[in-house]
């Protein structure tokens, strides 16, 4: 944190949540610092406009290696930006901006534009990776490999939904910046925020297409399952149709009434066998004649 106000130029202050909690005041930010959200409170992307500042949070759908999400809080005044980051989200972007010498004096808006642009710089590549995983899953379904489908499909659907929600929220943030209610940004900077908003909208459309693609793959999987179940039911129907007359025959002669002459006929047993074989042959021939070629 700063221990004195800068003499000139815009200042970017990077804190973590503990430093924010113990920092009672920063030079030039005494009246607004309490509006700064901590990184621990960052669960969505949002921007809240107040009379003397603009504050909000950023929460990325991707996370760190330990599985925790990349989040930060931020506060914007006319000449100052405060970022609250507990992990590895904001600091790498700040270093990149400094390295590329993009930190222009008296240009909070330009810094915010560069920062937000870095947030989405590789997102199209990440969405393409998700699409590749979805395509591989679709190819497995088409190849009849339906085992272990539900878990990766569920992960893909949750992931695409997270990215879509993220871009929808980020679009709202870009809209707040572009509207410039506090008058912090120049017309040129508002134009940059408009460009950023358009890129976010395109990424949101890409994520929506991925969501629809995952839904199509899920439908394809369900269709394959239904086809397999239909084949099983067809086999059971054929077996039942063939053996139902035999069941009737067995039940009929199983009553063993004394008045049944076939029971005492020496050819009765072979005759029943021949009748059963004939019934099976006739039933099978009839079913084959009425089956479509793909069911034979």
What are these regions (language model features)?
Residues 83, 251, 294-295:
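General alpha-helical segment detector with a strong preference for membrane-spanning helices
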Residues 138, 145-253:
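Membrane-associated alpha-helical segments
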Residues 279-283:
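Alpha-helical transmembrane segments of multipass membrane proteins
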Residues 285-294:
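Conserved small/polar residues in nucleotide/adenosyl-binding loops
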Residues 269-274:
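Hydrophobic alpha-helical transmembrane segments
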Residues 1-179, 186, 199-202:
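Peripheral, non-transmembrane regulatory/ligand-interaction domains of membrane transport proteins
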Residues 248-267:
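Helix-termination/interfacial motifs at the ends of transmembrane alpha-helices
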């Amino acid at each position: 944190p700063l221990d004195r106000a800068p003499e000139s130029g815009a200042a970017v202050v990077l804190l973590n949540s503990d430093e924010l909690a113990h920092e009672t005041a920063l030079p030039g930010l005494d009246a607004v610092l309490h509006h700064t959200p901590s990184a621990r409170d960052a669960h969505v992307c949002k921007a809240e406009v107040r009379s003397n500042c603009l504050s909000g949070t950023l929460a990325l759908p991707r996370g760190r290696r330990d599985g925790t999400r990349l989040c930060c809080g931020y506060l914007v005044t006319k000449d100052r930006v405060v970022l609250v980051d507990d992990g590895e989200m904001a600091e790498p972007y700040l270093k990149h901006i400094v390295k590329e010498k993009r930190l222009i004096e008296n240009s909070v808006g330009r810094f915010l534009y560069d920062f937000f642009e870095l947030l989405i710089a590789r997102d199209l590549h990440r969405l393409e990776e998700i699409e590749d995983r979805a395509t591989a899953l679709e190819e497995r379904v088409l190849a009849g490999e339906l085992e272990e489908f539900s878990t990766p499909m569920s992960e893909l659907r949750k992931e695409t939904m997270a990215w879509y929600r993220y871009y929808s929220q980020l679009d709202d943030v870009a809209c707040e910046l572009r509207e410039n209610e506090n008058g912090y940004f120049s017309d040129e900077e508002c134009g940059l925020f408009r460009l950023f908003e358009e890129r976010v909208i395109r990424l949101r459309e890409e994520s929506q297409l991925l969501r629809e693609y995952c839904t199509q793959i899920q439908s394809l999987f369900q269709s394959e399952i239904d086809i397999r179940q239909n084949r099983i039911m067809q086999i059971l129907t054929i077996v039942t149709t063939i053996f139902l007359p035999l069941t009737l025959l067995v039940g009929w002669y199983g009553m063993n009434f004394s008045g049944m002459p076939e029971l005492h006929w020496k050819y009765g047993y072979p005759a029943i066998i021949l009748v059963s074989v004939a019934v099976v042959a006739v039933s099978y021939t009839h079913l084959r004649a009425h089956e479509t070629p793909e069911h034979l």
